[in-house]
């Protein structure tokens, strides 16, 4: 054991579980199960499990893209890696993390010696304590950890029960007494029902021996998470273990740790100056015409200096009025191409009261991915609940009875780790918020349920009679008119328009493009809404600072009375600013909007991109396409038709010529000869 006063007793007098190797496994998870509060549980992060030595330096790591608390890989660090910069016993106290295995290598015996080798690989092992500083010592360590009478054992650290105070601390590798071990590879097979990990060898002794002879790390461990370890929520504070070798004499040991780090896959949005009130864009003024340059006369040849034209600047962002008009204009274009009879004369009104957007449940074909795609990192959190969704569509998960009216088809997720990605132009509306991607692991672990929806702005449709009636002076009370929203008129355009485009051709394709323009206008409006809320939050923070300054002044004035609270005879009068939650949510919303914009642009094909880049390209193609097609048909079939026509004329002419020639001659009658 770790204490020099604790010596090994005969096997018939003590519990054989008394011999353990100290291994400290520090499993620190950056963020407990409540990490990233308010985010979608299906959001994918870049997760990295790092194994550290006793000094908390990373010596081994593995990374992957998964939702939080769904990825528990097997950790396979080498035992000697954990000893880097560790206790002097292992011979690696001066080796930095991620260092290559130190030499010299062992000799190859009868097959020949290697340059710089120290000892024969086939030499019988002595009773020297195994170390990691040479290939021969690592071979000795391999045989010690694999033999039936040897091995190693692991003792838990800070998360052990309080009654196990006799197990000691890091100086004894948490194995100061027998009975503290919970896992390892020893002949008594230590185990536990509450510990968070199990540790074993990852290679057989024959496999490890050959790797050791090649002067490499040859003692990999296999660390697996138990069911208890996958359920704990205290990884942020870290958990430690100790590992000790089971050898004769004092058991050597070491300490190491494992921590989990995660980071968002989305882009980092820069934060710049943001005014309290967004400026409204005025109508652009026409650019003044450039003054004509005077031509140099023959008598005056002084050269004139021509100032270079200013470099083109990026157009300013659209103001509030322009954004709202873009929403209405996009709604009109989409409605005009899908239902042209309804746009002969109508009024489209943008609703100014919340909710500003509504969802339409649709049926669509989602894609199944075994690995997390890029759009799974865009975790949207718009204030869209299932109560604001209409229609019937595709549902996934355990849908409660109160929301089953939204489901036309309900699917159950199977077991396994895979991802369900919504089609382009749609989102999954879950009870935890909007998300473009679902994790089957999260759905199976929780009671989450989702509906496939389209997102539409709240634009109402009115016939002209409704608007005219508002200005007529009538004393008759009319019935409340029925308002049709854009979602009811165009619901399902994303899935229906794309499917119809395959069979109907150009019309459906243009309709889909108009929907994409409306979708882009919706994204721009959501960005401006986010900026407006951010401005409001900053204004509230500024007001809070003024309030706190006034409060401090009042406390000084009422200092003799015991402060402002005592003067007002109030028990407590503290001020708490909760705008930090708003600031965090707005930063996440800004990041998700940027990610969704990139995903929308990347989903467009090269053919659609040509129409979007050049506004005059569509008009040019539609104008010259007809004449070009006619000219192409003439060039393809014209020579054949012309040859047929010429041959027909030649045949008719030859017939006429034959008739003319036959009219100029008469048939001679045969002469009869009389016999003489």
Swiss-Prot record:
Pfam (any one): TLV_coat
Keywords: Cleavage on pair of basic residues, Coiled coil, Disulfide bond, Fusion of virus membrane with host cell membrane, Fusion of virus membrane with host membrane, Glycoprotein, Host cell membrane, Host membrane, Host-virus interaction, Lipoprotein, Membrane, Metal-binding, Palmitate, Signal, Transmembrane, Transmembrane helix, Viral attachment to host cell, Viral envelope protein, Viral penetration into host cytoplasm, Virion, Virus entry into host cell, Zinc
Renumbered residue ranges of the record's region Receptor-binding domain (RBD): 35-270
InterPro entries with a match to the protein in the record: FMuLV_rcpt-bd, TLV/ENV_coat_polyprotein
Compositionally biased intervals (Pro residues): 309-318
Region (Fusion peptide): 482-502
Motif (CX6CC): 565-573
Motif YXXL motif mapped to chain: 665-668
Subunit: The mature envelope protein (Env) consists of a trimer of SU-TM heterodimers attached by a labile interchain disulfide bond.
Comment, domains: The YXXL motif is involved in determining the exact site of viral release at the surface of infected mononuclear cells and promotes endocytosis.
Function: The surface protein (SU) attaches the virus to the host cell by binding to its receptor. This interaction triggers the refolding of the transmembrane protein (TM) and is thought to activate its fusogenic potential by unmasking its fusion peptide. Fusion occurs at the host cell plasma membrane. The transmembrane protein (TM) acts as a class I viral fusion protein. Under the current model, the protein has at least 3 conformational states: pre-fusion native state, pre-hairpin intermediate state, and post-fusion hairpin state. During viral and target cell membrane fusion, the coiled coil regions (heptad repeats) assume a trimer-of-hairpins structure, positioning the fusion peptide in close proximity to the C-terminal region of the ectodomain. The formation of this structure appears to drive apposition and subsequent fusion of viral and target cell membranes.
Protein name (Swiss-Prot/TrEMBL): Envelope glycoprotein
Organism: Friend murine leukemia virus (isolate PVC-211) (FrMLV)
Phylogenetic placement of the source organism: Viruses, Riboviria, Pararnavirae, Artverviricota, Revtraviricetes
